[in-house]
Amino acid sequence: MTHLFALSELPLDEIHRLLDEAERFRSGRIWRPAAPMYVANLFFEPSTRTKCSFEMAERKLGLHVIPFDPERSSVQKGETLYDTVRTLEAIGVDAVVIRHHEDAYFEALRHAVGIPIINAGDGCGHHPTQSLLDLLTIRQEFGAFTGLTVAIIGDIRHSRVARSNAEVLTRLGANVLFSGPEEWKDETNPYGTYVEVDEAIARADVVMLLRIQHERHAETMGLTKEEYHARYGLTLERARRMKSGAIILHPAPVNRGVEIASELVEAKASRIFKQMENGVYVRMAVLKRAMEGRMEHGRMAEKWHVVQ
């Protein structure tokens, strides 16, 4: 089954294949399934970029998108995530994309459903497609990962982006630096070294800024937005100390004037909107992988045989 739960479960050669496939889609490749295929997007947390880019990717691939709104579904009547996914499988959906507030929600589904599941973010756990689009953006800029220094700055403890990126970047040969408030350090993450923010920015080839995950905090932030920006944000002054050729990434949504000065969001070094563009191509590659796996192993195999 071609699930995608976390990049840590994929070998590097498969990650490179997905990036190569995304580049082919960026260059204009067209792929269509041999027969109608259906996908449902189950987003139990707010999303703009991830949800819309998945929908764009699905339509570019010619897939049929089944509307699903948790607020108007039987989830409101107490239906479990498992029963929701099994229902969609039973009515003929070929794959589901899920964002959920619970860490590792997919473990209850991994061996229990017969259709591919694509993780669009699980709590503080993993965000594999965000990491893939970040990798694609970095590779477009530098050509490779070995020897690069990537500084991940901000709310490390609560960030699934930090967790996913640090692991895969380390496997790819990059040097990962962490920086941020002491109370948001993640001492359980072995894939980076903590340094002061000024050092991280000065050393980095890639400055990756993180949104403060207010919705995951048990307590409110002890700093005002202005204080956070001054202490930990990418200010105009800090940006002037970046290496020549260094780039700025941010998974968005961006809080202008908090983790990054508003003037830097679309500055020459910023690749923030390039990341969003790449997100469509990466998700096309991931969906193609899921659908081809479905053709080989699931209900679609029978359809495929019939239409030959």
Curated annotation (Swiss-Prot):
Domain of life: Bacteria
UniProt-listed GO biological process terms: 'de novo' pyrimidine nucleobase biosynthetic process; 'de novo' UMP biosynthetic process; amino acid metabolic process
This protein's UniProt keywords: Pyrimidine biosynthesis, Transferase
GO CC field: cytosol
Family according to the record: Belongs to the aspartate/ornithine carbamoyltransferase superfamily. ATCase family.
Catalytic activity: carbamoyl phosphate + L-aspartate = N-carbamoyl-L-aspartate + phosphate + H(+)
SUPFAM superfamilies to which the protein is assigned, alphabetical: Aspartate/ornithine carbamoyltransferase
Described purpose of this protein according to its UniProt entry: Catalyzes the condensation of carbamoyl phosphate and aspartate to form carbamoyl aspartate and inorganic phosphate, the committed step in the de novo pyrimidine nucleotide biosynthesis pathway.
InterPro entries: Asp/Orn_carbamoyltranf_P-bd, Asp/Orn_carbamoylTrfase, Asp/Orn_carbamoylTrfase_sf, Asp_carbamoyltransf, Asp_carbamoyltransf_Asp/Orn-bd
Residues binding carbamoyl phosphate: R49, T50, R99, H127, Q130, A252, P253
Binding partners and assembly: Heterododecamer (2C3:3R2) of six catalytic PyrB chains organized as two trimers (C3), and six regulatory PyrI chains organized as three dimers (R2).
Annotated L-aspartate binding sites: K77, R160, R211
Annotated source species: Bacillus caldolyticus
Main EC class the enzyme belongs to: transferase
PROSITE patterns per UniProt: CARBAMOYLTRANSFERASE
E.C. designation(s): 2.1.3.2
Pathway: Pyrimidine metabolism; UMP biosynthesis via de novo pathway; (S)-dihydroorotate from bicarbonate: step 2/3
Pfam family of the protein (one): OTCace
Gene Ontology molecular function: amino acid binding; aspartate carbamoyltransferase activity
Protein name: Aspartate carbamoyltransferase catalytic subunit
NCBIfam families noted in UniProt: asp_carb_tr, PRK00856.1
